[in-house]
């Protein structure tokens, strides 16, 4: 039920994102969509660690984009159109009603048979075990994880060296 609602909210924010013009509104919409995706990822796994790390990475990227956008479009007015608000609220209401209808029909169809219920329970058990975070740090994938950590560290060092205060692209204008 919650996953269907999150799917509908993700689709709604995607449609809103396509209709935005202002860069700060685009960033805010992207941040809200990131929160929804992280909540959905956390609900699909056993723990919220993966979604928390994903959110922090996205938030760091959004902060860098926010710095660039505020230096480019600092004096633009941010106004919200009534047409876009009405359109997005209608889409959201439609998606939520559709998710409620789909949830009731799918649960009544699946609960009619005990065999189907046992298959659903078995499927959820396998999904929980397959999406566990233990696989991320065990033998076959630990090399990829260490490589990704080293790549992020080197990228951080390079970005710090590139964006020195008086020599980088984010320098003070006097």
UniProtKB/Swiss-Prot annotation:
The name this protein goes by in its record: NADH-ubiquinone oxidoreductase chain 6
Catalytic activity, reaction form: a ubiquinone + NADH + 5 H(+)(in) = a ubiquinol + NAD(+) + 4 H(+)(out)
Keywords: Electron transport, Membrane, Mitochondrion, NAD, Respiratory chain, Translocase, Transmembrane, Transmembrane helix, Transport, Ubiquinone
Membrane topology: Multi-pass membrane protein
GO cellular component terms listed in the entry, alphabetical order: mitochondrial inner membrane; mitochondrion; respiratory chain complex I
Role of this protein: Core subunit of the mitochondrial membrane respiratory chain NADH dehydrogenase (Complex I) that is believed to belong to the minimal assembly required for catalysis. Complex I functions in the transfer of electrons from NADH to the respiratory chain. The immediate electron acceptor for the enzyme is believed to be ubiquinone.
Family from the record: Belongs to the complex I subunit 6 family.
Domain of life (superkingdom): Eukaryota
Transmembrane regions: 24-44, 53-73, 82-102, 143-163
EC number(s) given by UniProt: 7.1.1.2
Class of this enzyme: translocase
Pfam families the record matches: Oxidored_q3
Main location group: mitochondrion
GO molecular function, one term: NADH dehydrogenase (ubiquinone) activity
BP GO annotations: mitochondrial electron transport, NADH to ubiquinone
Subcellular location: Mitochondrion membrane
